[in-house]
A protein has these predicted regions:
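Hydrophobic alpha-helical segments
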Residues: 1-180
Length: 180
């Protein structure tokens, strides 16, 4: 059950209504997480959507971005984002079994993605500055400085929705995912 106010889409007005209309046109529905964010802080919803649009134009592929989304959402314990992003990861080319691997912080048959999910899980779980060795290992896997910054951008975007959903206990409106 939601802990934060979430207006029904039909009752939204102003910026929230416009954002909800745009989201519905793009994805066919307004996910509960977006209803909650838009009901309480439409400017933040707009910013989050804009950030994700910018990241969609980055040098990171959809496959890489969805690997980050799954690894970070598992690390932070966000069941909602795992349910939302698992089908997107499948659409980006992962099998169901691979989505489970990504959530556990590895990918057996792709060294680059394996390095990516290990890096982002370390980034989210470690306290303080990452060691030069960790950053060098990520670069050695083929990631540029620009891609490191873009990776941090994807982590930032998914952590925002992870935190909203963990505080709100947002009702999941996607197919449930397997526990690991």
């Amino acid at each position: 059950m939601n802990r934060l106010y979430s207006a029904p889409e039909s009752e939204a007005s102003g910026k929230a209504a416009a954002l909800f209309k745009s989201i519905r046109q793009a994805v066919g529905k307004v996910p509960n997480a977006y209803l909650t964010i838009g009901s309480n802080a439409p400017d933040l919803l707009e910013q989050n959507l804009q950030l994700n649009a910018v990241l969609g134009k980055s040098s990171l592929t959809a496959r890489e971005r969805e690997a980050i989304n799954l690894a970070v959402s598992e690390e932070s314990g966000c069941d909602y984002c795992l349910a939302a992003h698992t089908p997107l990861a499948v659409k980006a080319g992962y099998s169901e079994a691979q989505t489970l691997e990504l959530r556990q912080g590895f990918l057996v048959d792709d060294a680059r993605i394996d390095a990516l999910v290990k890096f982002v899980q370390l980034l989210v779980s470690a306290r303080g500055t990452l060691s030069a060795q960790h950053v060098s290992a990520f670069k050695d896997a083929g990631f540029t400085d620009s891609q490191i910054v873009e990776t941090i951008g994807v982590v930032t975007a998914i952590l925002f929705t992870n935190m909203i959903n963990r505080v709100n206990d947002t009702e999941i409106d996607f197919a449930p995912v397997k526990a690991i």
